[in-house]
Amino acid sequence: MTKHAAYSSEDVVAAVAAPAPAGRHFTSFQALKGAPLDCKKHAAVDLSASGAAVVGGGPWFESMKASSPRRAADAEHGDWMEKHPSALAQFEPLLAAAKGKQIVMFLDYDGTLSPIVEDPDRAVMSEEMREAVRRVAEHFPTAIVSGRCRDKVLNFVKLTELYYAGSHGMDIQGPAACRQPNHVQQAEAAAVHYQAASEFLPVIEEVFRTLTAKMESIAGARVEHNKYCLSVHFRCVREEEWNAVNEEVRSVLREYPNLKLTHGRKVLEIRPSIKWDKGKALEFLLKSLGYAGRNDVFPIYIGDDRTDEDAFKVLRNMGQGIGILVSKLPKETAASYSLSDPAEVKEFLRKLANKKGARQP
């Protein structure tokens, strides 16, 4: 197996360790009935100020508050940034920690490479971001790890030289093309293929049809088919109907004990009840690339959602590489560093590619 070139940072004197943790396909868009709704306004509602009774809220209701965090006080934000400093501000020390090691890049899609938008079908990445990812992939093995269907995220990214892990890592495929001589040979890369939940396809399809019918009565709700999992989006649902979405989904899942319900940013996720997540996908890809159990590897995982926390935790447990959370506001995370938005992600990727490119003969 042909290796990627390891990253070297001779101009950086000292390595700085990552800081310790803080402790801690779509249905058609439903036209809104009655008065028009400003999705952005409703997406930003702070549930803690609602005062509305939420039947059966509990942990789910609390998670929705977490997905619409209040604006943090300056002091709180400053404390959080001390524990999760900007990966741009700490760029040189970060590279020093990777000195002599093989960088492997893992990237979430929504909220990381593209902005979060009301219509998930319109979550396109910019040409500038695509170029930044392409340049990074010239130098380092690069994977997109997304909750989206693998084919859909490939259609968004449009870079065939990457590894893609869709459906929260349950559907993994190696590159269709390897353009650089230092990449894993094409035959070996194409052999990287894994589907963790094929036996669940019929039941996922059945639940998709049922939920699609159920959500027709809730304006703004959408069901996305991600092959091995389903996403019920409620970003454009009125706040007073959020619990109705939750109850409808739970009522369907009572008939399917082999499926589990998780949540992200204004989305409910339905997945097979198997021990597989984005962290497992990261481990699988490192092993497939021949990097498992090696000390000369430096994985970097960048993501914005709670589903990315599984990957951040894997890196912490490995004691190798770093996790970078994309967030403007403080939130509990196992990531070591932070970036505020996709624009900063793009700048980070550009700097990484430029540093590596400057060292080429």
Swiss-Prot record:
It comes from the Eukaryota. Its cofactor is a divalent metal cation. Belongs to the trehalose phosphatase family. The keyword Iron-sulfur does not apply. CDD domains: HAD_TPP. Pathway: Glycan biosynthesis; trehalose biosynthesis. This is Trehalose 6-phosphate phosphatase RA3. Keywords: Growth regulation, Hydrolase. Removes the phosphate from trehalose 6-phosphate to produce free trehalose. Is specific for trehalose 6-phosphate. Does not possess activity toward glucose, sucrose or fructose 6-phosphates. Regulates inflorescence branching. Required to establish the correct identity and determinacy of axillary meristems in both male and female inflorescences. May act through a sugar signal that moves into axillary meristems. Acts upstream of RA1. May have a transcriptional regulatory function. GO terms for biological process: regulation of secondary shoot formation; trehalose biosynthetic process. Gene3D superfamilies: HAD superfamily/HAD-like (3.40.50.1000). Its EC number is 3.1.3.12. Expressed in axillary inflorescence meristems. Disruption phenotype: Additional long branches in tassels and abnormal long branches at their bases in ears. Abnormal identity of axillary meristems. PANTHER family: TREHALOSE 6-PHOSPHATE PHOSPHATASE (PTHR43768), TREHALOSE 6-PHOSPHATE PHOSPHATASE RA3 (PTHR43768:SF34). It comes from Zea mays (Maize). It catalyses: alpha,alpha-trehalose 6-phosphate + H2O = alpha,alpha-trehalose + phosphate. The keyword Repressor does not apply. One of its GO terms (molecular function) is trehalose-phosphatase activity.
